[in-house]
């Protein structure tokens, strides 16, 4: 294919042609850095695919919070796919792309990033609404989850499609970004400001949720529920903190790109900043498994099930090994959907669920805190 003169013009104007990595004499030769990134992306795809399979195959995970976790895993998986495609179409192939393909290549990264941030914010909004309304979990209200998830993706796609719809710097070279030569600096600044504002709003909502949970739990049991609230806080800090730690460097770099009148040398090292951001997609599944014993058991059951199936024996015993310990806990998930059934066993099941789950804590903590006053009344009636 021939070099596209428009792409060449923008890359030459921003100085990216002079800072491109040297390529071997053989066509299609890739440097070790790119190969390493491709391997990492493949691992991230497999990792998040395992999360999605674990949630899909385990009915006890079919509730609001795990739907949100599944959506985050889907965002991470698609982000890795987008970055992998970006790598495969980079280097020599970049100059051969049409402007439309270039916008699709870069816009897909913005779409998955936006979907991840909007999904984290949707989790905070859904938990906050549940706490404010003080209602227990109701499986019939799952439509609200899918509505939020659909809205997240719709807004993310619209945000990522703005450049291809006309908000770009084609024909206006002085306004072009150095890192993204066909993007106008105004669009880059707009996206980063929106993302940072959303992260701040998310932090405020999670802080308010924690305060509500802690104040409600102290009315019931100062010891056990305070530990539960602190565990919730730690989980939230890990999820949001890792996201901010991974993405903030590239946000700062893009803001520097907007502010610099002349290209700064560090802007030509953006690949490393993007790689750190993509690592967030690898960290999330690790957080899920470390924070939730249920998730660990589901992963082990899934992996060992594949191993047993490959060996052709022991499949049934392997599945029983990982399914039997969770039967008693699955009752607690069903009791959350039908709170009027077996009220005498609801409190032990809830305490067991609080101890056994990490991210699961987030899904039940709103219901547990919302029923705090009801449990006090039940405890008083039992004492009489």
Curated annotation (Swiss-Prot):
Pfam families: 7tm_1 (PF00001). It is a multi-pass membrane protein. Keywords: Cell membrane, G-protein coupled receptor, Glycoprotein, Membrane, Receptor, Transducer, Transmembrane, Transmembrane helix. Residues 315-325, 336-347 have a biased composition (Polar residues). Its main location: membrane. It is found in: Cell membrane. GO terms for molecular function: sphingosine-1-phosphate receptor activity. SUPFAM superfamilies: Family A G protein-coupled receptor-like. Disulfide bonds: none annotated. The chain crosses the membrane at residues 35-55, 65-85, 106-126, 145-165, 187-207, 236-256, 272-292. Residues 315-384 are annotated as: Disordered. Residues 1-34, 86-105, 166-186, 257-271 are extracellular. CDD domains: 7tmA_S1PR3_Edg3 (cd15345). Glycans are attached at residue 12. GO terms for cellular component: plasma membrane. Residues 56-64, 127-144, 208-235, 293-384 are cytoplasmic. Residues 349-359 have a biased composition (Basic and acidic residues). Receptor for the lysosphingolipid sphingosine 1-phosphate (S1P). Belongs to the G-protein coupled receptor 1 family. This is Sphingosine 1-phosphate receptor 3. It comes from Takifugu rubripes.
């Amino acid at each position: 294919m021939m070099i596209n003169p428009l792409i060449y013009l923008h890359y030459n104007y921003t100085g990216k042609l002079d800072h491109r990595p040297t390529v071997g004499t053989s066509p299609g030769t890739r440097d070790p850095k790119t190969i390493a990134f491709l391997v990492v992306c493949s691992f991230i795809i497999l990792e998040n695919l395992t999360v999605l399979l674990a949630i899909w195959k385990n009915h006890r995970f079919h509730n609001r919070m795990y739907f949100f976790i599944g959506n985050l895993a889907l965002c991470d998986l698609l982000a890795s796919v987008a970055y992998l495609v970006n790598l495969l179409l980079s280097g020599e192939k970049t100059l051969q792309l049409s402007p439309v393909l270039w916008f699709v290549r870069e816009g897909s990264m913005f779409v998955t990033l936006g979907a991840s941030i909007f999904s984290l914010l949707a989790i905070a909004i859904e938990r906050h609404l549940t706490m404010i309304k003080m209602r227990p979990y109701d499986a019939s209200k799952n439509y609200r989850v899918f509505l939020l998830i659909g809205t997240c993706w719709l807004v993310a796609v619209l945000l990522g499609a703005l450049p291809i719809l006309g908000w770009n710097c084609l024909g206006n070279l002085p306004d072009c970004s150095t890192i993204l030569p066909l993007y106008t600096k105004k669009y880059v600044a707009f996206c980063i400001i929106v993302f940072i504002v959303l992260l701040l709003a998310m932090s405020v909502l999670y802080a308010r949720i924690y305060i509500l949970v802690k104040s409600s739990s102290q009315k019931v049991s100062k010891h056990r529920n305070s530990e539960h609230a602190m565990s919730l806080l730690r989980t939230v800090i890990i999820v949001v903190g890792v996201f901010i730690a991974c993405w903030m460097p590239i946000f700062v770099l893009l803001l520097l790109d907007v502010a610099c009148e002349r290209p700064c040398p560090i802007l030509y090292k953006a690949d490393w900043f993007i790689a750190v951001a993509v690592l967030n997609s690898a960290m999330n599944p690790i957080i899920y498994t470390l924070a939730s014993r249920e998730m660990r058991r589901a992963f082990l059951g899934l992996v060992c099930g594949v191993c047993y199936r490959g060996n052709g024996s022991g499949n049934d015993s392997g599945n029983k090994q990982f399914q039997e310990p969770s039967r008693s806990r699955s009752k607690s998930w069903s009791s959350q959907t039908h709170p009027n059934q077996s009220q005498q066993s609801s409190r032990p099941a809830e305490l067991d669920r609080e101890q056994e789950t990490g991210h699961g804590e987030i899904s039940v903590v709103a219901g547990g805190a919302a029923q705090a006053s009801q449990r006090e009344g039940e405890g008083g009636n039992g004492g009489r």
